[in-house]
Amino acid sequence: MALAMMTVPALSMVSHAETWATFKATYRKTYTVEEEASRFDIFMANLRIIEAENRAQGTEVKGITKFADLTAEEFKARYLMNTPRNKTEALKPWDGKCTACVRFPEQATLLAAPPTAYDWTEHGAVTPVKDQGQCGSCWSFGTTGDVEGVLFLAKHNLTSLSEQQLVSCDEKDLGCDGGLQEDAFKYVKKNGLVTEQQYPYTSGKGKSGRCEEALIQNPVAFVSDWVQISCLGSCEKKAAFDEEGMINALIATGPITIGIDASPMQLYKRGIDNPKNCKTSQAGLDHAVLIVGYGVENGTPYWKIKNSWNTDWGEDGYYRIVRGLNKCGVASDAVHSVA
């Protein structure tokens, strides 16, 4: 039985051993004899979490993902950023200008009355979903996704840029141990980025790798600046974050990279996630992703987010989360590059 289709009723119809065997085959999991029993126990504990959350009949469906054999602590250590996101400088706020209008003039009229839904994947501004592997390099994927979209809207061809260059060569950030998109933007402004084809990703097993200087001599992408889209710092004392302003910025300037508390994403399968217990402060954000769109489904507003855990996770690599409540800090740290 396909794991993607395993809901609570389906799980009750098959033995735990069969479910475990299907999981291992689906995700090509192998363990030592000593490790097998402990991984099975963790898997069973996650099944209980999945069943409990799905019984609540929310707007999301939790299920067996490739991370179902990990504890929450292991998941964070292997796939999220372990370095606190300590900001060292304030960023200038977005000035509200429609910088993307050079490619889509009609976007200027949308700011007065934004549509109920918009998706940049349908307008050519988003490259295919990528895979960071067991490396806390999400910040580099958030950065490249943001720059890819901004340059596309500035009338360049959509080009997949090199995360590996940032992971290995950006000395301000910490490679597989985490980083900040704004520091990465600073690197891109000074050094530029080559394409993914020129400098392919190799850090999937957790090694940042040394900078291959010979591969970064012909950059194809630069940015001129970067801005803060939503409130941060003293703004956190406000009752609400400016998610409506984020909509305007998204439409006007393309996909936006954000920080998020990714703890609820470990067992996410599909639907609009509405986590009850996740962090919203800057210090609690442990993952970087790319907002590519928004919409409303059955009365529930959501953000559509491009993740970097390959297409075998979530909705073909994408994640949807409730919009308007700053869930998991989606509006706590939204930053954006400027072409």
Predicted features by range, described:
Residues 2-339:
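Catalytic-core signature of thiol
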